[in-house]
């Protein structure tokens, strides 16, 4: 799996499976993470596991992926059901849909660097973290 887009696709398949141990197949052991991805491979696995505990049916769908050399930029939509505690909010049974932007760098068929920005405001709004008067009327999710 040398192609950066193929590595990216496999990464999201693993996220959808919730099989964080399989990340070792597509991520370098010394992976560097930024923003929501955590600082390293261990933190990336923990982040994905935490999301999967709170949203067991979480699904990622790649909307756009643009590759240049060893970099792939993606716009990803996520959806799932809030069934477990997330950020101090107990499971609500609510369906959520939010988006994220990821930038990955691939070397020798493995992700060596990942940056992730997630629309946490929309997610928190959907699980009831904000009082109704502070909730926006529209979401940027499609």
What is each model feature region?
Residues 1-142:
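C-terminal and inter-domain tail/linker signature
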């Amino acid at each position: 799996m040398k192609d950066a887009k193929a590595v990216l696709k496999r990464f999201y398949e693993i996220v959808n499976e919730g099989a964080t141990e399989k990340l070792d197949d597509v991520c370098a052991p010394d992976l560097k993470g930024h923003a929501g991805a955590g600082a390293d491979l261990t933190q990336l696995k923990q982040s994905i596991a935490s999301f999967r505990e709170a949203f067991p049916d979480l699904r990622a769908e790649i909307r756009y992926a643009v590759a240049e050399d060893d970099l792939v930029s993606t716009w990803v939509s996520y959806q799932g059901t809030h069934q477990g505690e997330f950020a101090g909010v107990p499971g609500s049974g609510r369906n959520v849909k939010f988006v994220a932007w990821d930038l990955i760098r691939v070397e020798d068929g493995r992700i060596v660097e990942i940056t992730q920005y997630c629309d946490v405001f929309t997610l928190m709004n959907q699980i009831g973290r904000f009082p109704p008067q502070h909730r926006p009327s529209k979401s940027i999710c499609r």
